[in-house]
Swiss-Prot record:
May play a role in axonal development. It comes from the Eukaryota. This is Failed axon connections homolog. The chain crosses the membrane at residues 68-88. It comes from Mus musculus. The gene is Faxc. It is found in: Membrane. Residues 372-393 are annotated as: Disordered. Belongs to the FAX family. InterPro entries: FAX/IsoI-like, FAXC_N, Glutathione-S-Trfase_C_sf, Glutathione_S-Trfase, Metaxin_GST, Mito_Protein_Transport_Metaxin, Thioredoxin-like_fold, Thioredoxin-like_sf. It is a single-pass membrane protein. Keywords: Membrane, Transmembrane, Transmembrane helix. PANTHER family: FAILED AXON CONNECTIONS HOMOLOG (PTHR12289:SF76), METAXIN RELATED (PTHR12289). GO terms for cellular component: membrane.
Length: 409
């Protein structure tokens, strides 16, 4: 049996197969916030009825070859149009009237909410601000080519900074209410360090130096029997894009050792700023915590065995405890069980230590999920120890009352 394979995408792209067999995609690449994105479908169709013809394809005249290729392209286009109609129908089912619809990448395979620091930042912010929302994992980028983006009352906003400004204006929430002018200035400066500098060092570790592990975590739909091939293609395309964008940024012009040195300086700066405080700016939550958590969580849970993971779970243990506090407080369905933080569900035995898939609520509201937060916590777990032999919970990790959230109402 012979198979025909095609790639269908609504975004223009050019495939460059040069002498070194590199592959480059252009046209859908847009900006520093979430550069790695891939949208389209791998479509396969059987050609079993034309086995004899396909066997003799090499000797057929050019017009027959053209006919076969055109037929395959038409089949791919028809399948893609059907997919688009289904997507449109699904989108029509999403009612954004007085509801926040968060568009983001699909959940990865390792139980972490997102491999994207910006998607994790945005979803964590919505939970911190106690704003009910609905996830949509369609994979489609915003009009500006960004991910994540939201819909609210038929308005579409992309870019996490603009999304937060929009929600503050429309819904009156403000996680920075307790910050003074000086603290707000410090918060913005740290945000830019994390998103415009530390982010690129993480991207290098995730999509260049640790690509094979990242590929295992990547979740793709629509690939069918070609899922593994599609995952490999997406990861290597992303690797090339990240390296090219890092070079344009300037940080990619340094050696691997120098990039990791810059990463370590950023992480040490965050650890020094946090100190023994509960949150980055003090005892109260702020928008900065969503930003920092979205990025540190990548080092904590998506980069096994790498330098940033060893650093955060070893020497900079206060950052690990900070991540655990936020994870346990705002992500009750996120149970991560690796060598350092083991959380077992009430139904599971001590021997079962497998990744628990993320549970996606159709609509998430913290007031519904954390109704017993003041009492003994039902999802507290038994921790393991870090690389130094200290428990990740040697510091304050208990759950707060809702006083943390009164500031954003």
């Amino acid at each position: 049996m012979h198979w025909g394979v095609g790639f269908a995408s609504s975004r223009p792209c050019v495939v460059d197969l040069s002498w070194n067999q590199s592959i480059s995609f252009f046209g859908w690449w847009a900006g520093s916030e979430e550069p790695f994105s891939f949208y389209g479908d791998i479509i396969a169709f059987p050609l079993q009825d034309y086995g004899g013809i396909m066997a003799g394809l090499g000797s057929d005249p050019w017009w027959k070859k053209t006919l076969y290729l055109t037929g395959g392209a038409l089949l791919a286009a028809a399948a893609y149009l059907l997919h688009e109609l289904l997507v449109i129908r699904k989108q029509q089912e999403l009612d954004s009237k007085d509801a926040i619809i968060l568009h983001q990448f699909a959940r990865p395979n390792n139980g972490v909410p997102s491999l994207s620091p910006f998607c994790l930042k945005m979803e964590t912010y919505l939970r911190m601000a106690d704003l009910p929302y609905q996830n949509y994992f369609g994979g489609k980028l915003s009009a500006q080519g960004k991910m994540p983006w939201i819909e609210y009352n038929n308005e579409k906003v992309s870019g996490t900074e603009f999304i937060i400004d929009f929600l503050e204006e429309k819904l009156g929430v403000n996680l920075n209410k307790s910050l003074g002018p000086h603290e707000r200035a410090v918060s913005r400066a740290v945000t830019k360090m994390v998103e415009e500098h530390f982010y690129w060092t993480l991207a290098y570790c995730q999509w260049v130096d640790n690509l094979n592990e990242t590929r295992k975590m990547l979740s793709l739909s629509g690939g069918g029997p070609f899922s593994n091939l599609l995952r490999w293609v997406v990861c290597h395309i992303t690797k090339g894009i990240v390296k090219r964008e890092m070079h344009g940024h300037g940080i990619g012009r340094f050696s691997e050792e120098e990039i990791y040195m810059l990463m370590e300086k950023d992480m040490r700066s965050l650890a020094g700023l946090l100190g023994d405080k509960k949150y980055i700016m003090g005892p109260k939550l702020s928008t900065l915590d969503a930003t920092v958590f979205g990025h540190l969580a990548q080092a904590m849970w998506t980069l096994p065995g790498t330098r940033p993971e060893r650093l955060i779970k070893g020497e900079l243990i206060n950052l690990a405890m900070y991540c655990e506090r936020i994870r346990r407080k705002f992500w009750p369905e996120w149970h991560h069980d690796d060598d350092n933080t083991i959380y077992e569900s009430e139904e599971s035995s001590e021997g079962s230590k497998t990744h628990t898939p993320m549970l996606d609520f159709s609509f998430y509201s913290r007031t519904e999920t954390f109704e017993d937060e003041g009492a003994e916590n039902s999802f507290s777990r038994t921790p393991d120890t870090d690389f130094t032999g200290h428990s990740l919970f040697d510091s304050d990790v208990e759950m707060d009352d809702y006083t943390d959230h009164e500031q954003c109402k």
